[in-house]
Amino acid sequence: MAPKQSSHLTLAWAFLPLILFLFPLLIESRSTPPSHLPKEGKHHHQPFEFIKKLEGCHKGETVKGLHQLKQYFEKFGYLPRHLTNTTTNDDDSFDDLLESTVKSYQLNYHLNVTGELDAATVKQMTRPRCGVPDVVNGRTRSGKDGRHLNSAQLHVVSHYEFFPGEPRWRKSHLTYGFLSGVQSIDIQSLRSICASAFARWQRVSIFTFEEIGDVNSADLKIGFFRGNHGDGAHNSFDGFQGTLAHAFSPPGGHFHFDADENWGINPSSNDAVDLESVAVHEIGHLLGLDHSFDTSAVMYAYFGYGLRKVNLAADDIAGIQDLYN
């Protein structure tokens, strides 16, 4: 028996280095969170999730949570602020005004205009999106479809929009810099991504862009922020998978990312938002473009995780060239 026991010990000692090598890897794999989960420190709630519980609601009902729906429509411009009861949070009635508001939203996003919170409307409303309102100061769509296109393009329908009063820059060379907010991505990657995003607009417009070190002197100021960051309560960021970013029309120049999002660089899965895609969209706002209701356009308000949308569509190009003639 002695020789057999010795052979077993010899075999065990032979595999010991392999066991010692694999053990730390096994421990690490058990302690590492799945890649699709929000990064540490991120908010795990989804700000628009409450809308799913309201699916099927229609005029004449009183349902808990409808006051939040009214706040959603207020935030994105469909309901004037003086008409919503946002202080007491007790207005849960689906009245005529809310029905009209839902219809306006459905019309803008090419949904069936039912006035009810049907499945398609709820699905659209719960997607992550830009924080810039679709409607400003009660302004509805201008109805300018096809009006600005030349004779060779009359078969094309335009969906681009401008901000009220059509604000625009009075110069063609714009400088930009980076604010010292929350660091969500390393500065060199951010600089490279933003340079690429600006270049996409430069190729189709009158503009040239230059990064400068003194952000206070820059025309355009870019940074990452959380929650209420000084832009007013209605422009507060809301955490993971809500509003992704916002930017101000000329000559405002401020462009802010929500630091609580999972930002990625050309992500290959649905665990991150592509930083450059959102940057291209927000730069359009900086230059004076409002949201487009063309789903292929960069200036379309809604976005999603794992998507990459950086190439300007015909509608984006027509919009910026129309605004600056």
Model-derived segments and spans:
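Zinc-dependent metalloendopeptidases
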Residues: 2-325
